[in-house]
C-alpha cells in the first residue's frame, strides 16, 4: 500500500471553543448601553422572537413580581437562547434552590432582590458559582452551552466566568455597602431597584429628588471604579435620567415591561381611531 503524502494527512481536530453566547454580557462589559425588556405576563415563546426582531438583546424574566411558573420560565429561557437573546432571570428569593435552578435552566444572569449585607452576598456566590468560588451542585448538559456533554472542569470554569450573578441594591444601607458587594469575588455587577430604594428613602416615586439621585450616583461610580457593570431598574420611562446615569458609567436598564408595552400600543390604536372619528364627525357637520 502506498504511504499517505504529508499534505493528505488529516490533522487532529481542535477542541471546540466553549463559551456562553450572551450578547448582554458582551455589551455591558464593553461599556455599551443595553436596554432590557421585562417579562411578567407574556408566557409564549414568541416573546423572545419578537424582542429580537425589535432589537432587544436581553430579556428580564421576573419571578419576583409575577405568577410565572418555573416550567414556563425554563421554556422562555430556551426560546431566548435559540434566537441569541440573553435570558436574565430575577429570582423570587435568595434561596439556593431558586438560584441554582434558574442557572441550571439556562439563564445567562441571575438577579437577586433584597440583598442587605455582605454576608448575604457571599452566600449568593456559594449558590451561583461552582467550586472553588461556591458550592453550586454540578450538572452536565447545560442548556446555556447547547446541552453539550463537556468535561466537568471545563464546563464549571466557563459557567463560573461567563454566567452572571447580580445582586440588587434597594435600600440606603445597601447603597453604602455597594463597594463591598462589588469587591466580593463572584459578584458580576449590581442592579439598582429604584422603586424600593425611593420607598426606603421615604420619597416613593420621587426620582428627581437629590437624595435618590445621589444614591444612584454612588453605586454607579462604585461599579465604574472596579469595572463591574451597573444596571438601573424602575425608571424605564425616564430617559432623561437614564441618559444621565449612562453618561456617568451605568450600562444597562430595565427599559419597558410587556404589560406597559402592550398597553401603550393598544392606547395608541384607540387614540388614532378617536382622532379619526372626531375628524369624520367634523366633516359630516360641515357637510350639512
Task: Name each model feature, range by range.
Residues 1-288:
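Expand to "…catalyze enediolate/carbanion chemistry for C-C bond making/breaking, isomerization
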Amino acid at each position: 500500500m502506498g504511504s499517505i503524502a504529508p499534505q493528505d494527512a488529516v490533522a487532529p481536530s481542535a477542541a471546540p471553543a466553549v463559551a456562553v453566547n450572551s450578547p448582554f454580557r458582551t455589551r455591558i462589559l464593553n461599556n455599551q448601553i443595553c436596554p432590557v425588556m421585562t417579562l411578567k405576563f407574556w408566557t409564549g415563546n414568541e416573546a423572545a422572537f419578537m424582542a429580537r426582531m425589535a432589537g432587544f438583546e436581553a430579556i428580564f424574566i421576573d419571578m419576583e413580581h409575577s405568577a410565572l411558573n418555573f416550567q414556563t420560565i425554563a421554556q422562555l429561557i430556551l426560546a431566548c437562547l435559540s434566537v441569541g437573546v440573553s435570558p436574565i432571570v430575577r429570582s423570587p428569593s435568595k434561596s439556593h434552590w431558586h438560584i441554582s435552578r434558574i442557572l441550571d435552566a439556562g439563564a445567562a444572569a441571575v438577579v437577586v432582590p433584597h440583598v442587605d449585607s455582605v454576608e448575604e452576598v457571599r452566600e449568593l456566590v456559594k449558590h451561583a458559582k461552582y467550586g472553588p468560588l461556591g458550592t453550586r451542585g454540578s450538572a452536565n448538559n447545560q442548556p446555556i452551552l447547547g446541552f453539550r456533554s463537556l468535561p466537568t472542569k471545563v464546563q464549571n470554569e466557563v459557567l463560573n466566568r461567563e454566567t452572571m450573578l447580580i445582586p440588587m441594591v434597594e435600600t440606603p444601607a445597601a447603597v453604602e455597602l455597594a463597594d463591598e458587594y462589588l469587591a466580593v469575588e463572584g459578584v458580576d455587577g449590581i442592579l439598582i431597584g429604584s422603586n424600593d430604594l425611593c420607598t426606603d428613602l421615604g420619597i416613593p416615586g420621587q426620582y428627581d429628588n437629590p437624595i435618590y439621585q445621589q444614591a444612584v450616583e454612588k453605586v454607579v461610580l462604585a461599579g465604574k471604579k472596579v469595572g463591574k457593570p451597573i444596571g438601573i431598574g424602575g425608571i424605564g420611562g425616564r430617559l432623561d435620567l437614564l441618559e444621565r446615569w449612562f453618561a456617568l458609567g451605568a450600562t444597562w436598564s430595565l427599559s419597558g415591561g410587556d404589560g406597559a408595552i402592550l398597553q401603550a400600543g393598544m392606547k395608541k390604536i384607540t387614540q388614532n381611531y378617536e382622532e379619526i372619528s372626531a375628524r369624520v364627525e367634523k366633516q359630516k357637520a360641515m357637510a350639512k
